[in-house]
């Protein structure tokens, strides 16, 4: 063909096409050819909030294709990819998805007073502050020490000196501290200053604001100079979190202001130390007011509350479920992180993780993990030992993952060699403390070229460095061995292959959802349902039931009870009766109207028996007369009015001729789906009433997952390329949009779905739970999994809100009429579907509409009105059939409409509903 630029949309098109031939795929496939395979233990999917961009099924498919034996799914704070991962692998397939999470870990185990020996709060303290050339005690130097000695609550001595760092002071440090090279040029070296300072601190407890930073410099320099260093240290930042919970930030100036302490010359050591001393003195008084007089009791107070944990710094941490107990504990941790400890991120306190770590494997994660960060800041050997002891295995990652640390815009740019040293240090710690070290990719997209999707999403979120994407793709075994060749061939093989496989083999192949059905139990529900139905049947049809009633009731009850469905009917019955008692009708949706048991138990007003007459007074009934038989397949209300031949009272007209099989299937074993429309203004009360039925804590709202939609993704893509001044063809735009679509944005709740937990079961054995959209201000709790993922396990009640019951209640209040007593074949009501005469208005008064159905739900749209004009309904059953034709694709247009227009059928003879299929075609 001939390629041209289309003059309408300016897109490349091919004209004068003579033929089409499929070309071979020219892309080079990525395959893992190494004889032994690694296992990826750190992988994100689209369920990592606006971060991961790959579908879990594609990730698993790739790992299986490469011959890997397992892969760990570890999304940020969420486990919503688990069910799709489970569906991606058959039960018989040896491939093993490992279920985990990258948690936001909070170290609430660290004490307010480290190395406490129970000293009195009125003991001797040295409150000190350091100024340094940077943040690393290994790489950087002390340039000033300021301290005050406090005895019995009074300042008794001061210590202040510059220290010659023997290196130039960085410009940013000079700007921050106002200390320049000339000020420290003639100052003593640390070799002279530190022994003097230690003498000043003898027999005292050390106090500092963010003590871990200052103490790390003291400890590192003591180690370097061979000086003893074993102090008790109190951190006023941690203490402020306990004593000043109303604060959101705990910087020195913020805490000083909150306590009314003056701070001058901030970022000068002696002034900051004096300010911290005043702060600490006020804190001591606050502690004494609580009856706390020593450091041990202060540490007891420091056991953090949920509010404190929400304000503490968090670190990344990998948690893997090694078995089914671990899965339940993982769901418990995910739930509590969302419900109790959520503040921008779902946080997991170390103390809680420690308590429920059985069945779990805990990894140190990425550069956002506390171990990596401690190494970067030069933490002491003692601190590193404490951190390492918490983990089951340690992680290292490719240098490319952390290359952002070498950029000039970082506070302290690192070199590539330093990045290697950080990983080498982790490997050494693993050897020293007998912890396996594994190499992971921290996968956020499947292939290198997929970074464009994450780049655009991050740009859409406002990240200025979105274009500097780290290579967070899934690597082959050979690629990973090459990444870590600087460790030596043997060690690289160990961290890439041996250890990852060993960790994977410690995890059993489990299902993330329980396979069993766990419906709720209401004691004696079988008998209750039977009694309710027979009592109502006798009330309507008399003590001796007509054979058709007896047979239908017996057949339905047998199917319902034998399959364990009675409890579902009783639940629906209780909800409907409660709503009716409170003055609101309930509309039954869908096929529940085909169940005669639902009618007799008061769940629905729809009677599915064949059209018939019955007498409320003497219980006369007529199912079989020729006059009645003429209305087979129609609605009983369409039959002519009659008086009872026995007592002369007007007969009731009932029956819609709906087979039971349309509800519970041909064998009667299909689980009933009882959808109910409650008044919108009563819906919340109906939801609350489920707690009355089942008890508090036994019901949850059905959760949903909100993902990036096509149109939103298109907006992200379009805006990104417009900002870059780049033109992309529509086909390329659509390709990129497809890669961005489906990424999780938020969570929500089904408008009426209630998940019921049986007594004796724990929700965590089925799903984690959370607040919708992590709204901590609501008391609504939803399932963390999308409700479709667990609807085979737990009963879902559809308690939907609808305008119709509300409108009916309002009309009843306005008119004084009982809606249930208005006959369905009322002549004036039926005339609304043919003209406007009953309304006593002309079509011109309502925009030219020829019918009076504008205000009738489902019949007031332009499409529905045209259907009414085409079909000319005469009976109520015609309206039912029209409603059947109005739902579904190509049911009316080009189908039933054509048959009616051509005179081949009428609305009464066309196949319009499932009931017609059962009654006429089977």
Regions found by a protein language model. Give the residues of each.
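Substrate-recognition/cap helix-loop segment adjacent to the acidic, metal-dependent catalytic center
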Residues: 215-232, 373, 382-384, 388, ...
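Conserved beta-strand -> loop -> alpha-helix junction used to position metal-binding or nucleic-acid-contacting
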Residues: 95-106, 228-241, 297, 362
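Conserved non-catalytic scaffold segment of RNase H-like nuclease domains
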Residues: 121-231, 245-267
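Mg2+-dependent phosphoryl-transfer active-site scaffold
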Residues: 53-69, 76-85, 90, 99-100, ...
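OB-fold single-stranded nucleic acid-binding module
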Residues: 1-26
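Long, highly charged low-complexity segments
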Residues: 26-32, 110-126, 130
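Helix-rich "cap/lid" substructures immediately adjacent to catalytic or cofactor-binding pockets
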Residues: 530, 543-587
């Amino acid at each position: 063909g001939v390629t041209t630029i289309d003059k309408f949309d300016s897109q490349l098109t091919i004209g004068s096409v003579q033929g089409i031939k499929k070309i071979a795929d020219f892309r080079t496939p990525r395959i893992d050819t190494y004889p032994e395979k690694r296992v990826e233990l750190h992988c994100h999917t689209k369920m990592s909030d606006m971060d991961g961009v790959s579908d879990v099924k594609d990730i698993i498919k790739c790992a299986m294709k490469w011959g890997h034996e397992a892969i760990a799914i570890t999304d940020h704070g969420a486990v919503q990819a688990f069910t799709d991962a489970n569906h991606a692998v058959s039960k018989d397939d040896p491939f093993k998805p490992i279920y985990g999470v990258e948690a936001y870990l909070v170290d609430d185990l660290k004490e307010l007073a480290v190395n406490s020996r129970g000293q009195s709060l009125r003991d001797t303290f040295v409150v000190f502050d350091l100024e340094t050339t940077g943040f690393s005690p290994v790489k950087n130097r002390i340039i000033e020490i300021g301290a005050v000695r406090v005895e019995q609550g009074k300042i008794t001595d001061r210590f202040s000196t510059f220290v010659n760092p023997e290196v130039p002071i960085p410009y940013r440090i000079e700007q921050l501290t106002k200390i320049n090279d000339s000020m420290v040029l003639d100052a003593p070296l640390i070799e002279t200053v530190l022994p003097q300072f230690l003498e000043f601190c003898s027999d005292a407890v050390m106090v500092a604001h963010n003590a871990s930073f200052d103490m790390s410099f003291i400890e590192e320099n003591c180690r370097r100079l061979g000086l003893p260093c074993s102090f008790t240290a109190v951190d006023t930042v941690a203490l402020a979190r306990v004593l000043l919970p109303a604060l959101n930030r705990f910087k020195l100036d913020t805490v000083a202001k909150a306590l009314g302490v003056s701070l001058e010359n901030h970022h000068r050591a002696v002034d900051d130390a004096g300010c911290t001393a005043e702060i600490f003195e006020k804190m001591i008084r606050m502690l004494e007011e609580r009856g706390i007089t020593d450091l041990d009791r202060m540490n007891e107070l420091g056991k953090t509350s949920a509010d404190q944990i929400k304000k503490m710094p968090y670190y990344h941490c990998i948690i893997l479920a090694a078995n089914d107990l671990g899965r339940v504990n993982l769901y418990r941790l995910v739930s509590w992180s969302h419900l109790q400890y959520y503040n921008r991120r779902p946080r997991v306190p170390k103390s809680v993780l420690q308590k429920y770590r059985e069945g779990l494997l805990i990894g140190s994660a990425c550069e956002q993990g506390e171990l990596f960060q401690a190494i970067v800041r030069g933490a002491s050997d003692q601190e590193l030992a404490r951190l390492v002891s918490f983990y089951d295995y340690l992680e290292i990652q490719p240098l490319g993952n952390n290359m952002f640390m070498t950029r000039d815009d970082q506070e302290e740019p690192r070199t590539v060699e330093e990045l290697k040293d950080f990983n080498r240090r982790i490997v050494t710690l693993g050897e020293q403390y007998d912890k396996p070290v594994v190499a992971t990719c921290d996968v956020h997209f499947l292939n290198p070229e997929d970074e464009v999707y994450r780049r655009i999403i991050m740009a859409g979120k406002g990240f200025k460095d979105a274009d500097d994407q780290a290579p967070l793709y899934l690597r082959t075994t050979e690629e990973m061995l090459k990444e870590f060749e600087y460790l030596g061939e043997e060690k690289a093989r160990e961290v890439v292959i041996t250890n990852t496989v060993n960790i994977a083999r410690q995890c059993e192949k489990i299902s993330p959802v329980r396979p069993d059905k766990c419906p709720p139990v209401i004691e004696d529900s079988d008998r209750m349902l039977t009694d309710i139905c027979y009592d109502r049947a006798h009330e309507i049809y008399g003590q001796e039931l007509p054979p058709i009633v007896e047979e239908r009731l017996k057949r339905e009850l047998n199917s319902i009870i034998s399959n364990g469905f009675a409890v579902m009917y009783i639940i629906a019955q209780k909800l409907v009766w409660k709503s009716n008692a409170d003055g609101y009708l309930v509309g039954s949706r869908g096929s529940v109207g085909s169940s005669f048991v639902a009618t007799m138990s008061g769940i629905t007003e729809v009677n599915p028996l064949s059209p018939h007459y019955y007498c409320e007074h003497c219980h006369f009934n007529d199912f079989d007369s020729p006059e009645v038989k003429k209305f087979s397949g129609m609605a009983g209300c369409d039959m002519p009015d009659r008086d009872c031949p026995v007592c002369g009272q007007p007969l009731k007209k009932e029956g819609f001729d709906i087979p039971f099989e349309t509800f519970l299937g041909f064998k009667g074993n299909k689980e009933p789906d009882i959808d109910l429309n409650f008044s919108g203004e009563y819906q919340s009360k109906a939801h609350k009433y489920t707690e009355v039925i089942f008890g508090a804590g036994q019901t949850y709202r059905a959760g949903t997952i909100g993902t990036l939609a096509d149109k939103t993704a298109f907006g992200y893509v379009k805006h990104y390329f417009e900002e870059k001044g780049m033109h992309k063809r529509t086909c390329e735009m659509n390709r990129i949009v497809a890669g961005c679509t489906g990424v999780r944005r938020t969570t929500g709740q089904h408008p009426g779905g209630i998940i019921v937990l049986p007594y004796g079961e724990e929700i965590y054995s089925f799903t984690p739970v959370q607040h919708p959209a992590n709204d901590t201000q609501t008391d609504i709790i939803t399932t963390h999994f999308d409700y479709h993922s667990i609807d085979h396990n737990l009963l879902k009640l559809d308690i939907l809100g609808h305008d119709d019951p509300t409108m009916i209640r309002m009309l009843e209040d306005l008119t004084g009429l009982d809606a249930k007593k208005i006959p369905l074949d009322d002549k004036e009501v039926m005339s609304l579907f043919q003209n406007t005469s009953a309304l006593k208005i002309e079509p011109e008064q309502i925009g030219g509409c020829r019918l009076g159905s504008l205000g009738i739900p489902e019949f007031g749209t332009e499409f529905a009105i045209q259907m009414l004009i085409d079909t000319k309904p005469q009976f109520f059953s015609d309206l039912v059939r029209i409603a059947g034709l109005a739902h579904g694709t190509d049911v009316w247009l080009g189908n039933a409409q054509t048959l009616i227009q051509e005179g081949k059928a009428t609305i009464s003879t066309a196949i319009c509903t499932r009931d017609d299929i059962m009654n006429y075609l089977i």
